[in-house]
């Protein structure tokens, strides 16, 4: 029996690792790590805190007494003070020095920063694995000619692998963005109620050097390079917007990829994985719907819209802080991460099992290639003594006739036959067939793929080689 609502991001889409990042255990054990780091740093800077007190805090770092905290919060209506109380129940010797000099945002904001960095690192790992799978795909099909499309109308041929580099290029931009944001994240530190560190001035008898050192010591203990040099009670909520923008960027890239896959699947050129017993439609048993791509698109829409939340929060903060950020942050930030986690799992799953139908691709290409070969045909006819302007007009007329045969009469493209039968060109059918080699029209597609993989992708994969080899498990 399931009586209450469950978030689909948790039960259907996100992986276990990301759910652990945003779990209550991770959040509140990080609060306790921060209290330990604060106590250790204050002791090292001369405050009267004992090794015994710190040892007691460490002993209970991970066994969170949620029942005590929950009961206390019903009384005091304050989550941080409820957990200070609960920790003190477990650590009676250290109770008096927990949270010394700090305000709620010391644990709340610093923990948010730590957890967001953990989430970004997991997203980065999955992103790199998607890039790696796309690289294999691009290399495999780097020389396979296919119709390109502009305005979803047939255009000069490209290769299947070259098209995949376009998907990768957007992910490379996302990779660069996520690396920058991860590297630029700092802790809030220990700034006090309005960011002035006034409480620590009292604790350390006005010793500015010790107070500055306290911030850096906490950052070091928590694995950060430093803290933001100035703040109000909270870190600037623009940081949250920067983080969600990275996630929205990945969502945009993934959505674009699925647009192409869905259109290619309609053309029967490329197909996402379809399992042996998978059902496409409850009514139409023959259906092979691109449901993975559609799910990515759906989740991506959510993430892109979710990125508005931290923008609104940051823009409506007052002075040193207001609390109208809190409820929104608790929802929008975890859900953005959970959704992107699901997107990347699906992306990896699709690329790993994507099917390419080479004969269908060739058939579609050859149906359009006579039109695309006309410039070369015209040049060859000029070499045989023809007039360029006259040939151009004749090709225009014959192309319109061939187009009518295809669209109105349902016939094959007979443009080459029409040209061969026209005395204006002085070209035989055999000479015209020489213009029908698709590789003549793909330009540097193959070489561009090789250069891109060697110069852009391989260095990224080499830098992240320890993170490679992931597989994606799709729940439904």
Q: Could you tell me what each predicted segment is?
A:
Residues 117-128, 135, 161, 165-168, ...:
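Short amphipathic alpha-helical segments with heptad-repeat character
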Residues 19-23, 68-70, 278-298, 320-335, ...:
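Short beta-alpha connecting loops at secondary-structure transitions
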Residues 271, 394-401:
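Active/binding-pocket-proximal capping segment
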Residues 1-198, 204-219, 280-281, 291-295, ...:
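A helix-coil-helix interface module used to build multimeric assemblies
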Residues 302-388, 394:
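Long, amphipathic alpha-helical stalk/connector segments used for oligomerization, subunit docking
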Residues 135, 139-161, 271-287, 320-327, ...:
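Glycine-rich cofactor-pocket loops
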Residues 217-233:
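A short, charged helix-loop
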């Amino acid at each position: 029996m399931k009586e209450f609502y469950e978030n689909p991001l948790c039960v259907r889409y996100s992986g276990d690792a990301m759910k652990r990042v945003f779990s209550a255990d991770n959040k509140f054990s990080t609060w306790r790590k921060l209290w330990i780091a604060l106590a250790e740093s204050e002791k090292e800077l001369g405050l009267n805190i004992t090794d015994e007190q710190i040892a007691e805090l460490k002993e209970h770092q991970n066994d969170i007494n949620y029942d005590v905290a929950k009961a206390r919060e019903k009384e005091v209506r304050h989550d941080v003070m409820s957990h200070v109380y609960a920790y003190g129940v477990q650590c009676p010797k250290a109770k008096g020095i927990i949270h010394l000099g700090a305000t709620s945002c010391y644990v709340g904001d610093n923990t948010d920063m730590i957890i967001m960095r953990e989430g970004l690192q997991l997203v980065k790992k999955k992103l790199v694995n998607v890039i790696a799978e796309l690289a294999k795909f691009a290399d495999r099909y780097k020389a396979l000619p296919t119709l390109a499309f502009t305005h979803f109308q047939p255009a000069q041929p490209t290769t299947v692998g070259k098209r995949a580099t376009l998907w990768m290029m957007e992910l490379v931009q996302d990779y660069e963005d996520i690396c920058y944001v991860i590297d630029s994240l700092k802790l809030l530190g220990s700034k006090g109620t309005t960011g002035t560190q006034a409480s620590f001035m009292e604790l350390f008898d006005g010793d500015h050097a010790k107070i500055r050192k306290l911030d850096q010591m906490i950052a070091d203990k928590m694995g950060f390079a430093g803290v933001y040099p100035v703040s109000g009670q909270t870190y600037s909520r623009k940081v949250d917007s920067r983080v969600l923008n990275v996630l929205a960027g990945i969502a945009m890239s993934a959505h674009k990829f699925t647009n192409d896959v869905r259109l290619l699947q309609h053309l029967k050129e490329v197909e996402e994985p379809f399992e042996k017993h998978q059902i496409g439609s409850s009514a139409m048993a023959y259906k092979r719907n691109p449901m993975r791509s559609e799910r990515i698109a759906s989740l991506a829409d959510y993430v892109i819209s979710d990125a508005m939340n931290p923008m609104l929060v940051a823009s409506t903060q007052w002075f040193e802080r207001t609390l109208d950020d809190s409820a929104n942050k608790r929802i929008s930030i975890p859900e953005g991460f959970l959704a992107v986690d699901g997107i990347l799992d699906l992306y990896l799953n699709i690329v790993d099992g994507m099917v390419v139908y080479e004969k269908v691709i060739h058939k579609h290409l050859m149906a359009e290639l006579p039109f695309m070969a006309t410039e070369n045909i015209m040049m060859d006819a000029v070499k045989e003594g023809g007039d360029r302007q006259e040939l151009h007009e004749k090709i225009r007329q014959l192309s319109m006739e061939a187009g009518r045969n295809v669209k109105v009469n349902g016939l094959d493209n007979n443009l080459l036959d029409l040209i061969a039968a026209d005395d204006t060109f002085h070209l035989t059918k055999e000479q015209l067939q020489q213009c029908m080699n698709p590789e003549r029209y793909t330009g540097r597609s193959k070489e561009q793929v090789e250069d891109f993989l060697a110069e852009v992708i391989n260095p990224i994969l080499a830098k992240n080689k320890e993170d490679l080899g992931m597989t994606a498990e799709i729940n439904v």
